[in-house]
Amino acid sequence: MFLALTQDIPLDHVVPLAQYNHRVSIANTGTFALLSNICPHQNSRIAKCSTEHLQCPYHGLTFDRNGLGINNRYSLEKWPVYKNQTILFDQHVGCAFPIDTQHMTLVEHRQDTISATPDVIMDVFLDIEHIPVAHAGVYDQIGITNVDKITWFTFDNGSIQFVPAQEKTSMIQDDEKYNIGACWMAVYPGTMIEWQPGALFVTVAHNTNETSSQVQVYKYRDTRYSQDVWELNNHVWETAWSQDRALAEFIESPAVDNLDELKQHHRVWSQDAV
């Protein structure tokens, strides 16, 4: 699951994560690690926001940024973090993200609620054939007018799709070398990463109940591109996301027949993960 970009987490800070309902934090001590945000003394949450100091608000117990108790016998549970470019995950991801993400800066983080399960949301994300139907004309605005030649491949816990570069009028020289107009990466379960020249959009879907999901939305701007390029990217992505949300809510349940290879791959992974 996506956690953050390295540049989101200041050095010597601990940041609670919405993906874990703020029960887990990510710590940056020069290396990254996940820490429980629950005090083992009386099960109170510790941090409310990014902080340099971990002190439980209930009885005042303090911990260092490695999770060790300070003048107390307790310690916080700790888990590894996996770095992929500057993208941080709570799991190993079997494919390096192909685009340099070091210039991305977080513009917005929000939570959306969708009346669809994470599996249905992922199905829509993986589905290539719906693009010219559900998103007719949307991606034309960023120079993607033909999605017939999308290429893709799978890896152990996800897949990645590449849209060939078409019009490069707003693409900086550093990004022209990729020859990619867009890149869409799925990391199971529930993480969807979308790159357009000048922007990165990440969605992380979790069940809230049997029929709905909470989706953490992270929107990043590449600081090498102009504000106008960002605003166009943001408009295109929000339009496509609203269309995909509506489509997901219209799907009764994940399909079991007529599955393309990307959906089949996700089904096999889901079955093996049980």
Model-predicted regions and their roles:
Residues L5-P98, L200, R224:
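Rieske [2Fe-2S] iron-sulfur-binding domain
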Residues N37, C95-V274:
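C-terminal catalytic domain of Rieske-type non-heme iron oxygenases
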